């Protein structure tokens, strides 16, 4: 009988946390288990968004997946020094755990905590010939350089780049989220295997979902001719100003075109403060439970996605994939040369909004509000683009193939032909 291959996932947050990246790592564990892998997880006992909450169960075997949660102090993640201390605390705990544990064939390290690349030289010493893989969701120190609010931090980020360059030398495979991110990482001249494997949507309906009329009215009001929704995190990397500008132009041209913002993040309060009593075509809503998430995403006709240009290749907004998964094209406020900008143009799954084409976008939205056949055609294309290029099955099949290929020099690991069913998703995950 062929011995099952083994893999360890290392990431700051994991099930039952509801933050999107934790859900992706939880999904990955589940999907690799289905494909015949023995999966171990090293994570923390903390939640991303709920600073004072802890996960009590430190060791857990859930549906065959071995989860080990290292204790982490409740130091404030929103402050720079405590956040770095949290990272170092976890790095030391994880390395000690790996030192004591049986080694696995592969180790997949995510990019949270920040500067997790520092783990790789030590992992190489501890794990020998195991395959070391870096899955980059947020690129550091580039994220600090993109923020640029603190000159001292910016200087520190520049000084640490040579250390990160050295750490990449110990990685075998680097997984990025898009071509621009791959280009940024390639600037380190790492000469390692590079591959783009995007995150998938948390909800993947098999057909384009129908709109719930009651929920649509709750979100956009009555007599809506076109609904545009921003759903998810509104953080430092995102912008909303151009969305407000076109909404205010449309308020007079076509009152039936409505905008809704439903989310959280560093800039969400700024958005709410920017609204006036005259912005009656702009609504603000809270998060939806996972049971309501698919309905929430489907009630919009078009989804809003944004990324500031200095963040191109540093992060890739996951809401892009969630939008396509429910058959909704995107209005993307960002650079046409960014990862999402390139996909929007290549797959014709949305529009790009910038300061030079505001009036053009406004006119297109007015036209779409009246031409439902064109809108439906656009939505069907968005749904098919997701199925063909970004679905969880497609991405995880690529992950499985990649991981098994790394073992060919030691003997081929056959693929699992009869995957078992395993699902430990939490019913309270967020958008």
Model-inferred region functions:
Residues 1-63, 250, 414-431:
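N-terminal subdomain of nucleotide-sugar transferases
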Residues 268-294:
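Nucleotide-activated donor-binding/catalytic signature segment of Leloir-type glycosyltransferases, i.e.
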């Amino acid at each position: 009988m062929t011995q099952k291959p083994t893999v360890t996932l290392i990431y700051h947050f994991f099930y039952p946390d509801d933050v999107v990246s934790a859900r992706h790592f939880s999904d990955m564990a589940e999907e690799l288990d289905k494909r015949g892998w023995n999966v171990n997880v090293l994570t923390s006992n903390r939640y991303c968004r709920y600073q004072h909450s802890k996960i009590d169960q430190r060791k857990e075997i859930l549906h065959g997946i071995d989860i080990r949660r290292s204790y982490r102090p409740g130091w404030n993640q929103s402050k720079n020094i405590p956040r770095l201390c949290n990272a170092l605390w976890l790095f030391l705990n994880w390395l000690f755990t790996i030192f004591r544990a049986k080694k696995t064939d592969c180790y997949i390290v995510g990019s949270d905590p920040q500067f997790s690349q520092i783990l790789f030289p030590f992992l190489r010493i501890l794990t020998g010939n195991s395959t070391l893989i870096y899955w980059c969701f947020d690129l550091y120190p580039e994220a600090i350089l993109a923020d640029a609010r603190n000159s001292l931090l910016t200087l520190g980020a520049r000084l640490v780049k040579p250390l990160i360059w050295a750490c990449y030398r110990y990685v075998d495979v680097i997984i990025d989220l898009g071509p621009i991110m791959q280009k940024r990482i390639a600037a380190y001249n790492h000469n390692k295997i590079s591959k783009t494997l995007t995150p998938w949507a948390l909800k993947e309906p098999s057909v384009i979902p129908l709109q719930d009329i009651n929920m649509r009215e709750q979100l956009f009001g009555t007599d809506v001719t076109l609904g545009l929704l921003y759903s998810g995190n509104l953080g430092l990397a995102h912008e909303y100003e151009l969305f407000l500008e076109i909404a205010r132009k449309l308020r007079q041209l076509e009152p039936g075109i409505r905008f809704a913002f439903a989310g959280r993040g560093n800039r969400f309060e700024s958005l709410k403060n920017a609204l006036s009593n005259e912005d009656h075509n702009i609504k603000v809503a809270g998060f939806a439970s996972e049971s309501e998430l698919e309905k929430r995403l489907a009630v919009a006709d078009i989804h809003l996605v944004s990324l500031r240009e200095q963040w191109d290749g540093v992060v890739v907004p996951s809401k892009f994939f969630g939008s396509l998964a429910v058959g909704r094209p995107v209005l993307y406020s960002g650079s046409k040369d960014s990862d999402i900008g390139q996909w929007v143009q290549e797959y014709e799954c949305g529009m790009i909004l910038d300061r030079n084409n505001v009036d053009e976008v406004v006119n297109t939205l007015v036209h779409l509000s009246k031409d439902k056949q064109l809108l439906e055609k656009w939505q069907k294309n968005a749904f098919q683009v997701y199925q063909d290029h970004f679905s969880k099955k497609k991405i995880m099949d690529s992950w499985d193939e990649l991981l098994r290929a790394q073992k060919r020099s030691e003997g081929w690991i056959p693929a699992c032909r009869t995957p078992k069913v395993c699902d430990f998703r939490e019913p309270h995950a967020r958008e």
